[in-house]
Amino acid sequence: MCCDVLIVGGATSGSFFARRMAEQGFSVTVLDSYSENKIGSKYDIFHMCKRDFERFGLPSASKDDGTWAFEFSEGLTSSPYGNFPKTTYDTVIGMHMHEYVLKMNRWAKEKGARYIYGAKYLAPIFEGGRISGVRYEKDGEEKEIFSRVTVDCSGMNAYVRTSLPDGYGVENFRLGGNDMFYVILRYVKLLREKDYLNGSCGWPYYKTWIAPQHDPHGAILGIGACNSFSDAEEIYKKFEENISLPDHEIQYFERGTTPYCRCPYSFAADNFIVTGDAACLTKPLNGEGITSSMVHMEIAARVLTRALKKNRTRKEDLWEINTLYNKTQGADFCFLRAVLTKAVNAKADEWEYFFANDIIFSEPLMNAVSTGEEIPLTPDVIGNMVKSIARGVKKGVITKDTLKTVGGGVLLAISIKNHYLKFPASPDGFEKWCKKADKIWQKIGKMQ
């Protein structure tokens, strides 16, 4: 069996990329390890901004087909003690994940994409030193499929990327416990009508939030923490001690993980592309990755289309995926990730000062992140941020250690963003660029 584009992973990222390539007239095959009645069942509910349906040309959610669950337009982000809320206005659609993934599968199939469900990825196939397909298992039988280009959309396990040999062109690292968020979702019933939700609220100090769910009398209380689910539960206890939550009863829990680390430096190698959670393309502020991955895939689809038409799919021919992404959303995300990684070391009272003085958590920044616009981080904005922290030290509300840590984090954020803006236009100089990036990321460290 042969095709132009082979995609491993058929959920949101795999389906989006399949549609993009199939509508260009290429033969596309999608493998997914889950059966058709289980695909996209990691969580029941997920959210997407309404404007992103038009932005990415996605099929709309509908009550008629069971994809639509609810809708809200106001989001709040509050301090550790529930003060100084920052408001974002962006209509959000809540959807049933399994049903919407199936709809995206059908959407890709409309343009000719072929899906093979229950196909467990085994290993890449190489010919002449380049990937030319994969081996997989279905119904207990080992099979092979060949392709001009293989795309890893297999989620955070990154089955294809992590099975590539060292030095192939894309890093093959696996995620450790401090490279991801451990997410616990409490689906709850709200006991008082006055507490029914018409929007969401987040408390980034605890990495917690409350949002509507499919039951209009209910809510989802979520937390994402590094290292382990037990750490998440310990932080949730502190959250409950400091934030007054509406009276509620637990209905059920969902647990999962999402990447929270830097992306591979390169997303492309000979006959190969990695994207989605397999490439750690999640938003620094909340760990979500569906639409941020689509930004990357729009770039990848354009570059790959040109490469396939020229019948040239070497690393050099796909390199523009790296430069276009790393110099735009990639650079902005690196800046935010660096700042937040250092900011989490501040104490709750210091975060209160951050919120009161629009340090990091300002409405312009929050709205830019929400809408996907360019993040307003001009030199003046950054300079005022550092000055505000320094004033907090003089007032005795910010410790000198926090000034050093957060201020140093801002400087590292500037350094890593500027470095990504200088991403090499070709593989020449890439190794040298990586060595410097490694040094900066080592200083930034991991989220705690």
Range-by-range predicted roles:
Residues 87-106, 159, 226-234:
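Short beta-strand to alpha-helix junction loop
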Residues 10, 111-245, 280:
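Predominantly flavin-linked oxidoreductase catalytic cores and closely associated redox partners
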Residues 14-15:
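N-terminal Rossmann-fold NAD(P) dinucleotide-binding loop
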Residues 305-448:
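C-terminal helical "tail/cap" subdomain of flavin- and related membrane-associated enzymes
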Residues 1-11:
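Beta1/beta-strand and adjacent pyrophosphate-binding region of the FAD-binding site
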Residues 33-76:
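N-terminal FAD cofactor-binding segment of flavoenzymes
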Residues 6-8, 22-42:
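Glycine-rich FAD pyrophosphate-binding loop
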Residues 121, 227-301, 307-309, 313-331, ...:
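FAD/FMN-dependent oxidoreductases across multiple families
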